[in-house]
Amino acid sequence: MRILVSNDDGIFSPGIKALGLAMRALGEVFVVAPDMEQSAVGHGITVRRPLRFKHTQSAGFGEIPAYRVDGTPADCVVLGVHLLGRPDLVVSGINLGVNLGLDLTHSGTVAAALEGASLGIPSIAFSLDTSGEVLDFQEAARWALAIARAVGERGLPPGVLLNVNFPASRPKGLLVTRLSTHRFEDQVVERLDPEGKPYYWIAGTPAGEEEEGTDLWAVRRGYVSVTPVSLDLTAHGFLEALSGLLEGVAP
């Protein structure tokens, strides 16, 4: 099995190192990751400038081929597939921080898996709750390996990827979940530069309902959350009603 490993925290993150080294148990591994932090960039693809794709031996992957890209996580997957050959599995992470609920819409970690899935490759995004006193990437990587092995052996339906979140503590087990309403309520902080001109930081505080059976509910109770995510964003349940709503509409 050939496994492409990427992330959004950058190639020097301890999370991608743990994930990449763990994946060696499944076969041939190659790492393609951003050369700097790319958190919250979403599924952006770089089309207005050239990209650099450089081999690196300084990221701690040993004999695993590793490449750094001055682009987004999705860029990394595109270049990895086209320059290094099509993998059998794409894994992204392990992200420093959870990607729950509506986080998926801006997560670079999930975007790498989305790109893999859009190319028809079974793909998984892994994220770790960093609210604990110790970040146990090794334990998360053990679970990631077990999940990746199952997907590698049994496959995923076309157009479906997995979004996996690990709790801050040692996992009690694994639960298959649905997405929660977890999100960040944006806050805009205004400050002044030395010339007295305003500049802004966008921050946010976590919000959302902790409903039973959701990813947020599972992770907060110490379980590994595994959520199937579909590339098809159509609101199928609203199609018929929308036809009625728009009946007779014309300029």
Swiss-Prot record:
InterPro entries: SurE (IPR030048), SurE-like_Pase/nucleotidase (IPR002828), SurE-like_sf (IPR036523)
A GO CC term assigned to this protein in UniProt: cytoplasm
Gene3D superfamilies per UniProt: Survival protein SurE-like phosphatase/nucleotidase (3.40.1210.10)
Keyword Ligase among UniProt keywords: no
Catalytic activity: a ribonucleoside 5'-phosphate + H2O = a ribonucleoside + phosphate
UniProt-annotated binding residues for a divalent metal cation: 8-9, 39, 95
Alphabetical list of Pfam families matching this protein: SurE
UniProt cofactor note: Binds 1 divalent metal cation per subunit.
Domain of life the protein comes from: Bacteria
Keywords: Cytoplasm, Hydrolase, Metal-binding, Nucleotide-binding
Any one GO MF annotation of this record: 5'-nucleotidase activity
Enzyme Commission no: 3.1.3.5
Primary residence: cytoplasm
Role description: Nucleotidase that shows phosphatase activity on nucleoside 5'-monophosphates.
Protein name: 5'-nucleotidase SurE 1
